[in-house]
């Protein structure tokens, strides 16, 4: 006997729709890197075309760096030193500091522009860090000689994974080789390098400070990173010249944007 139709079950399945007539074609990127100017255009397009504001991109960027830092740190007892600038790179750094602190890490933020009156998103992210009670100190007070070294470093590694992790969020794509790092920042990057030599692991946000995002040329006191977390696509300067030497392992994160975002958003760019 034929079973009566169930009036509550749709005639066409909404759980298993019919396959599309056209076969699926995987999206492929055309662009392999971004210049400084293309990165700025991409940030603008994300807001105007996809309605994804810079705050969301910044949050995703900070989360990406946080995930790398957790792998490098090895344990929550590993000290994390976050160097923050005054631009969007610094905003990413403040997000990262907040997320790491919320996950139980001991975080110190080193302000590379003490006394500067922050505005916009960077101010917002910085205030969130202050509200949590995270220590913010002038970067000139960072003392790399106090980091673990020698036998003591070996002991620390057994207990906490690494002696410490340094996050470089001082300057991003805005640095141009034609304008050398000011002496104030050179002093800070020199301290970071001393810490690196003493066993600290260094993560650069988007591009190491002192590396030109377009040419790969680098300041004499540019930061040397073990890993660089770059966003959307690698910056052109990471793939050539000294930029390739200083960037370490390059990790690319889409920060919440479609995989072909750069191609579609910048299709009118030269």
Q: Whereabouts are the PLM-identified features?
A:
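An N-terminal, well-structured beta->alpha segment
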Residues: 2-81
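YjeF_N-associated NAD(P)HX repair module
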Residues: 2-34, 163-270
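Conserved active-site and cofactor/substrate-binding residues in soluble primary-metabolism enzymes
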Residues: 30, 34-37, 52-64, 88-91, ...
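Generic structural hydrophobic/aromatic packing signal, biased to beta-strands
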Residues: 39, 100, 109, 229, ...
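Short, surface-exposed, charged/polar-biased interaction segments
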Residues: 60, 67, 86, 249-250, ...
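Generic secondary-structure boundary signal with a strong preference for alpha-helix termini
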Residues: 63, 74, 97-99, 218, ...
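Nucleotide and nucleotide-moiety/phosphate-recognizing core
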Residues: 66-172, 180-205
């Amino acid at each position: 006997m034929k079973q009566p139709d169930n009036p509550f079950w749709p005639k066409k399945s909404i759980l298993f729709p019919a396959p599309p007539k056209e076969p699926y074609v995987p999206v492929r990127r055309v662009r392999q890197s971004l210049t400084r100017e293309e990165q700025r255009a991409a940030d603008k397009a994300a807001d105007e075309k996809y309605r994804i504001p810079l705050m969301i991109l910044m949050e995703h960027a900070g989360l990406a760096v946080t995930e790398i830092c957790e792998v490098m740190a090895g344990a929550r007892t590993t000290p994390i030193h976050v160097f923050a600038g005054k631009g969007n790179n610094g905003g990413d750094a403040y997000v990262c500091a907040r997320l790491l602190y919320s996950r139980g890490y001991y975080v110190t933020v080193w302000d590379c522009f003490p006394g500067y009156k922050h505005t916009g998103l960077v101010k917002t992210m910085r205030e969130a860090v202050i509200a949590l009670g995270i220590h913010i100190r002038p970067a000139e007070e960072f003392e790399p000689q106090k980091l673990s070294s020698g036998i003591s470093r070996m002991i620390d590694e057994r207990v906490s994974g690494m002696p410490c992790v340094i996050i470089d969020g001082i300057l991003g794509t805005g640095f141009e080789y034609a304008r050398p790092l000011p002496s104030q920042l050179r002093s800070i990057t020199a301290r970071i390098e001393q810490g690196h030599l003493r066993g600290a692991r260094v993560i650069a946000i988007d591009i190491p400070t002192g590396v030109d995002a377009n040419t790969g040329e680098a300041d004499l006191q540019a930061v040397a990173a073990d890993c660089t977390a770059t966003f959307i696509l690698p910056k052109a300067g990471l793939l050539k010249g000294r930029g390739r030497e200083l960037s370490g392992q390059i990790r690319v994160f889409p920060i919440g944007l479609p995989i072909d975002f750069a191609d579609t958003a910048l299709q009118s760019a030269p």
